[in-house]
Regions:
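N-terminal organelle transit peptides
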Residues: 1-51, 82-84, 98, 105
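Hydrophobic/aromatic-rich, well-ordered segments within soluble, folded domains that form packed cores
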Residues: 37-39, 49-74
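Short amphipathic alpha-helical coiled-coil/interface segments
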Residues: 61-65, 90-97
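Amphipathic alpha-helical coiled-coil segments
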Residues: 68-72, 99-104
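Short, charged early-sequence alpha-helical segments and their helix-coil boundaries
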Residues: 69-94
């Protein structure tokens, strides 16, 4: 009884499903996003600083990284970024990294 009453609120919320076919829950989504956003900012430095694409990517990636660093709760991250579920944000960040590679070449 003690654990349910007092420890329950201390535990982080656990997402059981994304509700999207083929998109599994990522239990450490915040950490994955922080890593991907840092990788994106590093990768986009290879694009000329005058390129509008680079400016846009840096702007939204810095914002999303800031949100992930400020918020510990995945629901708050989803709410503030307003770009879908954290798992969808991971897919988008991976896609952006692939696009940066294509933009370089």
């Amino acid at each position: 009884m003690f654990l349910r009453r007092f420890a329950g609120p201390l535990l982080g919320k656990v997402k059981e499903t994304t509700g999207l076919v083929g998109l599994d829950v990522v239990p450490n989504a915040r950490e994955v996003l922080i890593s991907l956003y840092n990788d994106t900012l590093k990768a986009v430095e290879t694009i000329p600083s005058s390129a509008e694409y680079r400016k846009a990517v840096e702007k939204f990636t810095k914002f999303r990284l800031q949100v992930c660093e400020e918020e510990k709760d995945w629901e708050k991250i989803e709410e503030r970024i307003n770009g879908g579920q954290v798992e969808e944000l991971i897919v988008m960040a991976k896609d952006e990294l692939m696009l940066i590679d294509k933009m370089k070449g």
